[in-house]
């Protein structure tokens, strides 16, 4: 990157945005683990729906898994993806002077994709968190251009 990007504000914005992703990814993973023993967070309100999921095969893999196990797997893999984005952003903030210039637009793109998903399919808290994190990535990129 060019010398302009070595501003401490660029690093701070990247680390803050990454921290938001890390917090949400960690909470999502923790809630998924806790739901294995006592389902009450990332589960349907109606317990009969979760029971139906456990008793229903996944059409892509009949007999190999059920919808409940697939749901748990989707939640874990989603957590891993969010954690990796957060870790990448924090790492980028710590290594700002040696980064390729495309890292910030890539983080912004990833943040925007998560924001669209959050607004369309999730609930307000993750959407707000993703919006804040993505705004931090945009601020870092804009600051790097000054």
What are these regions (language model features)?
Residues 2-15, 91-102, 142-146:
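Helix-coil boundary and interhelical linker segments in multi-pass alpha-helical membrane proteins
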Residues 8-22, 69-79, 83, 101-108, ...:
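Alpha-helical transmembrane segments of integral membrane proteins
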Residues 10-45:
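N-terminal signal-anchor transmembrane alpha helix
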Residues 19, 44-91:
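Core segments of alpha-helical transmembrane spans in multipass integral membrane proteins
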Residues 19-29, 76-90, 108-115, 134-141:
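Hydrophobic alpha-helical transmembrane segments of multipass integral membrane proteins
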Residues 40-44, 105, 111:
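Membrane-embedded alpha-helical bundles that constitute the cytochrome b-like, heme-associated redox core
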Residues 93-105, 112-131, 144-146:
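Membrane-helix boundary connector in multi-pass membrane proteins
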